[in-house]
Amino acid sequence: MNKPQRNPEIVWRVEKRRQAEVLKALEAGEDVDDSGTVILLLSGMMHQLNLVGGLIWQQCDGQKTQADIAGELAKEFSVEQVEVETDVAEFISDLTERGWLSNG
């Protein structure tokens, strides 16, 4: 079973204030930009993940399957799990190809 695990060489942090602002804006029905809510540092480069990418990243602990992660995301955004499964799989696949995740 595929349980994505973050690359331990990547230093990362959650921009909690920014994440809270974006979640509040979404709840109010406002459009949100793709501002980073999670910052990754790798090989001297800084990368930002938007809200959804950041929420997925935070759950890639080697304990949860892709389906578990999709389920959590579906709950967070009050949608059916099937609506997010493909996006979660594609995002995890992309980060795995970059070497940022592995299959735990």
Where are these regions (language model features)?
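Acidic, low-complexity/disordered tracts enriched in E/D and polar residues
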Residues: 1-54
